[in-house]
UniProtKB/Swiss-Prot annotation:
Pathway: Protein modification; protein glycosylation. UDP-alpha-D-glucuronate binds at residues 87-89, 118, 155, 160, 185-187, 300-302. Its EC number is 2.4.1.135. It comes from the Eukaryota. This is Galactosylgalactosylxylosylprotein 3-beta-glucuronosyltransferase 2. The gene is B3GAT2. The record marks 218, 310 as: Interaction with galactose moiety of substrate glycoprotein. Glycans are attached at residues 67, 292.
Amino acid sequence: MKSALFTRFFILLPWILIVIIMLDVDTRRPVPPLTPRPYFSPYAVGRGGARLPLRRGGPAHGTQKRNQSRPQPQPEPQLPTIYAITPTYSRPVQKAELTRLANTFRQVAQLHWILVEDAAARSELVSRFLARAGLPSTHLHVPTPRRYKRPGLPRATEQRNAGLAWLRQRHQHQRAQPGVLFFADDDNTYSLELFQEMRTTRKVSVWPVGLVGGRRYERPLVENGKVVGWYTGWRADRPFAIDMAGFAVSLQVILSNPKAVFKRRGSQPGMQESDFLKQITTVEELEPKANNCTKVLVWHTRTEKVNLANEPKYHLDTVKIEV
């Protein structure tokens, strides 16, 4: 009997010693400091979807720590709006011209298109076109008096003035936001780089124009960052020997000069630009753009006159197609 007990004792003895050693080692470990650990709530979501720890000391304590460690982001400056005033009139290539222009404007951020028809009422063609253009736009109309439609007289005067009047009325009772105005005739072609250049206009900015005045280009002559003359094919003695596509005006300048318009009376052919700019600026104040007026970023392309010699006098097709 005793031998059986001794046998069992010696069998259990190693296991008893192992348990005693393990208990002795565990009790000698240093006790970790009782510090609060962050609690990750499934309802607190940070930037990028990451969970944010909620402090045990209370929500106010946690918010204060975050605000101290991370500065508040500053709001970005507002991008100046570009207002493009485009006179247009009914002709076979009208929709084609406007389509090319819209495809350019659609790629320009913060642009508002003011389209002014030379008509007594808004046409269905232009109304449908603007509705599908996907652009912030305003559709105006004003007819040119018959006596001013003779060859050699300035064109689109009433339409440009209607666009100016709309701008002034829009900002009459509110603080004007940063903006830039330019006159975008529908027979021009524009580089997207031009819109980046004109957006920083402080008062009146200028640049070269291609395929105009019987030359490959016309441009302001610049020395030491100032306009000192004009490279032009016609009447370099004009106060501002520049094409309508060659300048932009700050919105604030337009609003500060409410009487500045394009004139009919006393204005000679080819002098519309000079007569308008004389009312709002001087040559010394002009801001050269396009690398000191050495890059052409707009072209007066003009669509070729359409040959419709074979067009039937009466509509013969079974369907009516808008062109």
